[in-house]
Structure formats: structure tokens, C-alpha cells
Amino acid sequence: MSAGSSSLPVTTIYGLSTEGYKLASSIALKGAKVSLVDDSAGMAISLKPDLARTYPDVNALIEDGPLLAVEPTDLAINNAAYIFFAPRIRKTGHDVKIDVASKFQDAVKHVKKNSSIIYTVPTGFGTNSENIALIEHITGMTMGKDIFYYYMPANTIPVSNSDLHIGTYKARQDSQLAKLLSTNDSRKKINFVDIGSLEILHSIRILGHYSGMASILEICRYVREGQTTTEITKGSFNEIYLDDVASGLYDLRAIGASLGGSSPLMYLVNGTIKSIEAYVKHLIDETRMMLKKRDLKASRTKVTIAWTMDQNEMRGDKLDLLSILEARLKDYIGEVETQHGSFDFYPTEKTMMVIACSKADFNNIVKRNINSDLIVIRATPISQTLL
């Protein structure tokens, strides 16, 4: 243990996710004792500073997982003064809430008195109050007296203000937590705010991001062949790829799930979600239209969905959309595959069609396959095609 590490509390991160590892690595490099729980294995990895320096991300860590020192999950949580809840979420629909609640109960039942729980999963309105009630029920402790709770939603939406906001129970300030989360960037401040206020701030950020996007997706569905002028296709709004649409979808659904009854906000959230679902259908229709326009037979065509994504990020919405897109394309086209990372396409007897789901993927495909006969479709509001 390094000098100065004795001033930092023992910390456990629950969840072998990209966000969880980023937290664990950052805290370990400060010299704190850190454990990283793999809930699927029921074990915790002891993350020392040298390991945090060796493994740049969770993918590299997972590859060498069997070689790392581990301890039981209950012991890692019980020894910790601070427990960050950052699991990988892979369930969808109504199963999401049950899955997250199950993981949270697993983390909470082993906490000790005077420990602090930091919930990093984005929520809607009132979910944190439910979490607090659950903690008190499971542990028998009193919130704010025997145990403490914070809300720190992991953010995927770019923000102009780089300050970190942490929701606290009864506006409690925590200098130790601030130390664990501090960075070398003097411009980034840590602000403790009321939990309810942070739920509102996060919801405004998500809805502000998606309301404009949903409007673009809906309007662009009215663009017909022959109307795709340079002004339309070169517009910045046509740089919205499927990857961008999926980035905060979990958060949007969480907000919708927390709303009851009928209200303008409920209609706004549900309408936005339906726009995204319609966008996926539109992409499939565009692919089918391309086959028809070029007089291509589905049996003689191979479609590759090119979408490079982080397989271990907390939210599973990109994987879910990828699965939906792949399944629906297979209803019309016999051979459909997914690829990520390096895109090298070799000649085959079939016509090759590639759907680029992010700007980085599109640029990579074009760069690596300059002389190829690929048909490349950009997964944007106005799906442009390159041959």
C-alpha cells in the first residue's frame, strides 16, 4: 500500500462493467484498497495499482481474469466503506427492473454499518427513494445514521459543463467520497446536491438530447427519393447514426418506466422511444428498397451489420438494438452477419451490402475497402448509399 493510501477508505465496485472498471482503476491508482466484483462469477478481483496500470480497460482485464487474485463477493463488500453499484445490464423490457433490483439486493445484503452505497445506474423519478427503502429493509439500518446513500448516474451524453454532480440523502456532504472521485482537472468540480434534484437534472439532460433527435428522425422519414438534395444529405442532422441514437436509450426508458398515468411528459418520452423503434424499421425498409432498386435477389445477397461497440458497457441497449436489427433483416435476407473493429471484406459470389452503424465504422469501412464493390449504407436519418 502506497504512502498516503491509509487516508483513503477501502472501496468495492460491484459490476465488471466498463464504467465500473474505470472507477475502480482510478481509485486504485490513488492508492486505495479496491475490489472489483464480477457478479456473474460471485467473486471479487483485488485491483492493485500495478494491475490498474497494466490493464487499460475491462476487456483486457477479463482476458486474464483466471490469473488474478480473487476473494468472495460477500467479504469484499463487507470490508468496504464505499460500495459503487455499476453492474452490466443485459435484460430488456420489463425484465430490466427485476434484473437490476436482484443485483442491487445482492450487493446490499453484505454491507456493514457506516458504509456508503453509490448507485451509478441511471434512474427515472422516485427510484432512488425505493432503493433507500430497500436498503433499510434488508439491512435493518437507518439511512443517514447507520448507512449512507448517493446517486451518481453514469453519463453517456456529452455535456458542456464537466462538473460531477452527486445526489445525496438529505444534502449530506462527503469529503472522503470527493477524494476518491477527484481528478487532476482543476476545472472539474464535485457538487453534492439533493437526490431528487439530480433525478430532474439527469432527466432534463436525456430528454433535451433525445427530443431534438426524435424530431429529426420523424421529419426525415418524409424525405422521398429525388428530394435528397445536397442541403439535406450534407446537413449535420444526417450525421446521427444508430450508435448515437442508442447511447442513452436505457436512461430514456428508465424515465418512462418511472412515470405513471397520462401526462405530456409521458407522451413525450413514449413518443421519443417509438421514434427510435421506427428508425430501426426505417433502416430495414431502406435495405429492402435497395435490393429492389438494384434488382438484387435476397438469396444472392450478404448483409453485414458493421457496429463497433463496447461489449462490457453498463447499458445493454446497443446490443439489444443490434440483435433486433439482425433478426429482422434475417426475415428477408438469408445471410446476415455482424462485425466490429477491423473491416476487411473479401470477394464472394454474393453481392455484399454493409450497414455502417456509426460514423467511425463508416469511415473505417470506406478507408479499408477503397477498391471494393461493397454497397455501403449509412445508418443515418437519410440512409445514403455508396457503391
What is the predicted role of each segment?
Residues 21, 87, 103-105, 109, ...:
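Rossmann-fold dinucleotide-binding core
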Residues 199, 209-296, 301:
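Interdomain hinge/lid region at the active-site interface
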Residues 9-28, 36-40, 273-323:
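Glycine-rich adenosine-cofactor-binding loop
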Residues 15-18, 38-40, 86-88, 120-123, ...:
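Structural motif
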Residues 61-116, 343-367, 372-380:
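Rossmann-like NAD(P)-binding element
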Residues 33-82, 89-96, 135-139, 324-349:
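Conserved N-terminal Rossmann-fold NAD(P) cofactor-binding segment
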Residues 118-121, 149-151, 371-387:
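Short beta-strand elements of ligand-binding domains
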Residues 41-47, 125-130, 312-318, 361-365, ...:
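Short, charged/polar "capping" segments at the starts of alpha-helices
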